[in-house]
Regions:
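Short glycine/proline- and aromatic-enriched beta-strand/turn motifs that initiate or cap beta-hairpins
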Residues: 9-87, 215, 220-231
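Transmembrane beta-strands of outer-membrane beta-barrel proteins
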Residues: 47-53, 77, 93-101, 154-160, ...
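Bacterial N-terminal signal peptides
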Residues: 1-5
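Residues that define the transmembrane beta-barrel architecture of outer-membrane proteins
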Residues: 45-47, 73-79, 131-138, 152, ...
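Flexible, solvent-exposed loop segments that connect beta-strands
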Residues: 62-70, 106-131, 165-173, 212-214
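Short loop/turn motifs that connect adjacent beta-strands in outer-membrane beta-barrel proteins
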Residues: 37-46, 86-97, 147-154, 191-197
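Residues on the lipid-exposed face of transmembrane beta-strands in outer-membrane beta-barrel proteins
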Residues: 51, 55, 79-85, 138-146, ...
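Structural signature of outer-membrane beta-barrel domains
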Residues: 56-58, 102-108, 161-165, 204-208
Length: 231
């Protein structure tokens, strides 16, 4: 009878609080989901608020545009505020609309004056160069993130907008307003569930769309970094 009582007591002890045990299991599972990869996934309707900045070390002529002598010595600095909204998402990918407000764009060694001298042996062209400041808006942007559930997310993007400079860019007769077209890639590294660092490179193209004068575009690879918060 004593043995029977011990067995009965153990059985009662094991099933005394089944609801509490189940709740503990649920809490544990939810904690694993938050602390695991799935907690880093962005969902449809998620908003991004961020800032980024970067620059290029040298303009490129690989894709046409400026001549070698016109592109020489040029650098470009840019800083922007970012708003993004996730349009569609699953565990593998996320598609986002992006808008960038650009308060600062600096084209260094920009050609502001061009002089050509005719000599008996040919012609000599000289340039006057200076830093030219501007700003603008990039309202048309799409970004596709991969590995949406992971903490580190590779992405590709394409953007279009415009910049207004204090002087014509990239040539003296090109006009102060320029259209921009960008395409690039990078990674987002989430430092917490709602904050991320961004590292990337983008091909940045500037041209006036044949609105005035010369339409030889300025092309450059911009390396940049940024920080974003998601809500």
């Amino acid at each position: 009878m004593s043995c029977s009582g011990v067995v009965s007591l153990r059985a009662q002890s094991g099933s005394e609080h089944p609801a509490i045990d189940e709740a503990a299991k649920v809490d544990s599972t939810q904690g694993q989901e938050i602390n695991g990869n799935s907690g880093y996934a962005v969902r449809r309707g998620t908003n991004e608020f961020g800032v980024w900045g970067g620059g290029s070390f040298q303009a490129t002529t690989v894709f046409g545009g400026l001549h070698e002598d016109e592109a020489r010595g040029r650098k470009f600095i840019i800083a922007a505020f970012r708003y993004g909204r996730t349009l569609a998402a699953n565990d593998s990918m996320a598609l986002q609309y992006t808008l960038d407000v650009v308060p600062l764009a600096v084209a260094t060694n920009n050609i502001t004056q061009q002089t050509t001298l005719i000599t008996p042996t040919g012609s000599i062209t000289t340039f006057r160069r200076e830093a030219t400041y501007g700003g603008g808006l990039t309202p048309l942007g799409l970004q596709l993130d991969f590995r949406n559930s992971a903490r580190v997310k590779p992405f590709v993007h394409i953007n279009a907008g415009g910049l207004l400079f204090a002087k014509p860019v990239p040539l003296p007769d090109a006009g102060k307003f320029a259209f921009t077209l960008e395409g690039g890639t990078g990674v987002r590294i989430f430092t917490s569930l709602r904050r991320a660092l961004t590292l990337g490179v983008r091909l940045h193209h500037i041209s006036n769309g044949n609105l005035s004068g010369s339409n030889r575009g300025l092309n450059q690879f911009i390396f940049y970094a940024g920080f974003s918060a998601f809500k």
